[in-house]
């Protein structure tokens, strides 16, 4: 059968002439709220009738008549009596009532018996058990469709827990689809029924205590508004609660009394504001209310009035189409007879085929007489009024405009003051030095304060910082409640928790977190255990005292062996006068006891000496000693760098396993913090063992704050388990603290918000923006760096101080003092055994000191023993020598006259030796060769004998 579509104003005159009266088409309307200052149902019927009758296309004088009957009570008797008054008038349809379910059921039964169409304009009651009459049509959307639409919204917002407030017990049957979805998905839906007092306050308090954030209100417009006002009084109208109204008159609610415009209130609307007559219809209602009422009861047309308006048009359209196929007539009926209207069934068939656009949108019915193929607009309350953010269609389902919804949330943050709960914790939040002179947010400083300023600048909101009452981050109690900042968020006492609040799975179940603004992990903080402080003789530290002792013994042993070997081997005995090889009976050994002690010293100091080993045995001793000193010096040099450039720490533990395997060092964490929860819930064997130790240790190893933990580390044998960021901060400011090992886990700090916070996505985007702009890293460097302790890499480049190598200067000074003292002893000893002099010892010493200061008198007579003769230069015999002579410095003295050569040689008094007759200078005895010297009278006979021996063998 083809669908029927007809304009509402094209009503031919012949259609109007088929009624029982040749001049009218009669429709009956039953109103249960006939007051002028109510929903405006009477006015809407009048407007529909007049608009149809004023249509210029209408021919003749026939017109539509609507008889209005008032129903004072929802009574079966009065309803039946009213119907008995309507049937004799010969009506083609009965409309209403709008708010009397019992009366509506009686009317449907009577109309069904007489086969007169009946239009309902109220939601069905007892949908599952009531038999829908064929003659009954319902313009009001079914509760089943509304239930499916609510379920779609809950799915869109990922709501896993919700509370359904019912004004009547029948709502459990009406919203069966919604209940079934929660049963299938295993989500939580609590149902609360209003009591007979109709006071929702106790019910709302229970919902608040249950921490339920999504509330579905299934009640009429008046009761829904009352519930919302009571919720506002309890502080439940905020950004952390979501209200969903199933009443289709949501757009008529007055929200002016709501203080917090951040509340997320959603509802449905079926009004078609694009309809050509909608504005005129609304203006007429408002004008009527203003003229006849003390106040305007609604902000727009009530749903029942719009449905009655559309019902009149639907009946007229169906009658028009029916009359095209057959002539219809209407005759009076009676309650006392079994007579029916013969055209009633045909008209019902045409009514089910009607399609038109009315004030409530598209009008179409299914085979059951229920409205179909329509759409519900989803509205959200904003500071600018109600805004459509999506729609639900019977066939297409839910479609939401996420951009509009997000923009409403962003706009709701504008110029909004958020309560921020936090805790004093360096460097996240600290009191300024002069905080007594300030008030409000100006009293605080720190990383979180700066980050809040950045976020407020991006999202354009205001904030008020408030310290948490109990001074803890938040842990669950045995009764299921939470303490600290987490507890305040759950109780909706704060909008944000901005601090070093760790994101954990347990906390995520009860509050929402933003994206992490800082990544960290648990670390071990322990005090620095330094070895003995560096002293002046710390250059001896590379070797232990035992090594130094064995080195001394090795030195003495080598000296003794060298002295012994040099005495035994014949190759270390040689003639002191190589010029007289084979003619001198004297042999000399250079390894005296003093030289044997000096030679190893020169090798050990890598300076060498003038003593060179001749024999293989002495060279073997020398080589072994040099190899020994090479290894010793190399080892000393390598170890000296480690000992003097880096202060070595003596740490008894190096990892978390070392800490868990011992009991001498106590360890613990902050009570009620995320680190404590980490160890408590960990399944790793080492961490479980650590938790058992911390939990059972008495006195308790847990601390209340980070400052208390730091003090305990410094003043006792205690290791503190805390976040790596705090570890880094305090190590920068106390050089006696160090981190042991690496991180025990990886986690992040986030901004806490109550469950269901509509600002979560906005803060996520703002945090990502700060990270991309590197603002968070800049803030961290600002508050973490600048400590008095240098970075660890700076220790390697630190110069050595006097406390490290001052001892070597002490050794040098002592050696110089000993050398001066020995020189004075030698000076005095020489003077005492020299020839008698008229000059005193003091004068001699003064003279030498003066020469030293003036750098003069490098040559002076040799001091001889008492009774000895003073040395005199040798007298050279004048004879013609060879043309040249080689001096001791390796230079050639020119040929010239013999006298000149002799005079030149005589000037080299220090190089002229006794008994030498050669002009060449001997490299061993440094004597001249080639000239014969006359012995002076003071020369002994032994010297003269030596001259004779040497001269007799020399060629002339």
From Swiss-Prot:
Subunit-level organization: Homodimer. Can form functional heteromeric receptors with GRIK1, GRIK2 and GRIK3 subunits. Forms a heteromeric complex with GRIK2.
Primary gene name: Grik4
Main location: membrane
Residue numbers spanned by region Disordered: 931-956
SMART domains: Lig_chan-Glu_bd (SM00918), PBPe (SM00079)
GO cellular component terms, semicolon-separated: cell projection; hippocampal mossy fiber to CA3 synapse; kainate selective glutamate receptor complex; membrane; postsynaptic membrane; presynaptic membrane; synapse
Organism of derivation: Mus musculus
Protein name: Glutamate receptor ionotropic, kainate 4
Membrane-spanning segments: 546-566, 624-644, 805-825
Purpose of the protein: Ionotropic glutamate receptor that functions as a cation-permeable ligand-gated ion channel. Cannot form functional channels on its own and produces channel activity only in heteromeric assembly with GRIK1, GRIK2 and GRIK3 subunits.
